[in-house]
């Protein structure tokens, strides 16, 4: 059993595995995964590349706390689709399934989970009440301040996370052009917008900024979002 749990811990991170699965093996596993050789190079103990360790030591007084924080798993942020639910309703539904959730710190639509469940299999996801999106990306959409009935262009839409957020903020009114040069990434937007119940988004693959589809819209947009490179990275 311990070998199997160790494999899971190495693959997903021990903090992402529920205590109900780890049981009494949690502490032994943590000890196994914790560097023990104090004679090992400092960057090995910190589990970071040497170049990063050297820079951090110079730039940060409390670099040990930084390295410890880097070893922690990031929480999972959801954006609540306010066309179908409220953050309070989503938190209540998650709580009923035994998942601890809380509101985000900055985005009104953000709900943060302490674990990373198989969310895509849950009704709350399939029904389009939530979508996975980190709080920072949610704020990008809010900074655009889209209004109902406006013409908006998401110039580097990618898989459409911020496009969907814009669509919800506009209450599925107006028109959003979702452009990207990567056809494969943009293809993921269509099923997501259907699940979200949005009808104001129009995805299109373009060659570059001089594409005819873009030229036709010159001077017609109320707002344009250009998030390049993607803030999510």
Task: List the predicted regions and their residue ranges.
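S-adenosylmethionine
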Residues: 1-233
